[in-house]
């Protein structure tokens, strides 16, 4: 029996998955690495050592911070967009587009015909890092920010292109007695606006949309803002059970 391991090393997290020959997920791990990428990946691999004994094992790395680790370790590397596409084509084959938010990047992948990727630039606006910054500004955890957003009554316009500009929008609202619940939802709406307007570049988002990445996996309020903004019903807004580990799963599929 052969097993395949996929490791996705991003800007803030390491995701490790183990697939069997039928592409069934046997193990998954999602952890922050705090810049100790190799150490965190090795610790996770060590924890599943017993599962690998007596098996033929293949391993592939992906992710924005994975190439250096792959080169230093002599392990195969696959670009993240191809890893994600491999997982989507295998597990959700009728997908029209993917929206993926990471720690410091955001991307949209269009399927149907040639694969087309749109990715944000060097600014972390509209990403997990932006959400972390805004939670700190409001003196709450990211989970608390999410819970607050679900009780909102109105949405304020907030710039998400840059944390500095967003802060200049948020502080006056709070100073004037604005509800934290409304500001929290407005922060998520800013992420949605930045992603949709900044990355579609006029191309219509339609059909079945799959949402991937840690922020979209863990934050219900962020999911809600995307679904309402894009006017998606349940059949067209897909949030996979392991959407935070899809790129790692795709890397394993490429092994």
Locate each region found by the language model.
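Short glycine-aspartate micro-motif
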Residues: 2-8, 58-60, 94-100
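Short glycine-rich, Thr/Ser-proximal phosphate-binding strand/loop in the N-terminal lobe
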Residues: 4-39, 43-46, 115-117, 121
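Glycine-rich phosphate-binding loop plus the immediately following alpha-helix
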Residues: 36, 113-154, 162, 253
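Phosphate/pyrophosphate-binding loops at sites that engage ATP/ADP/AMP, CoA/4′-phosphopantetheine
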Residues: 45-57, 195-207
